[in-house]
Amino acid sequence: MKTQVIIFIMAVVFLQLLSQSEAFIFDLLKKLVGKRELRNIDLDQFDDMFDEPEISAADMRFLQELLK
């Protein structure tokens, strides 16, 4: 149990460290490039990936049977 708690705490710390470093890199990039250039970045370019599900009707029936 102690090992699981320690691993969980380490995972939370590493995820926090990752998010802070990502924010630092983006802030540094914003300072180098300029705020006007970053406003034109198209952050919605990945929305097309999630428009239509790739699961067929047969797969949905199988999953419904599996989860009963």
Swiss-Prot record:
Propeptide: 37-68
Cellular location(s): Secreted; Target cell membrane
Function description: Antibacterial peptide with activity against both Gram-positive and Gram-negative bacteria probably by forming pores in the cell membrane. Also has weak hemolytic activity. Does not show antifungal activity.
Family, per entry: Belongs to the non-disulfide-bridged peptide (NDBP) superfamily. Short antimicrobial peptide (group 4) family.
Organism of origin: Hoffmannihadrurus gertschi
An annotated GO cellular component: extracellular region
Summary of the tissues where the protein is detected: Expressed by the venom gland.
Protein name according to UniProt: Non-disulfide-bridged peptide 5.6
GO BP annotations, alphabetical order: killing of cells of another organism; monoatomic ion transport
UniProtKB keywords: Cleavage on pair of basic residues, Cytolysis, Ion transport, Membrane, Secreted, Signal, Target cell membrane, Target membrane, Toxin, Transmembrane, Transport
Record's signal peptide: 1-23
Upper lineage: Eukaryota, Metazoa, Ecdysozoa, Arthropoda, Chelicerata
Transmembrane segments: none
Domain of life: Eukaryota
GO molecular-function terms, A-Z: toxin activity
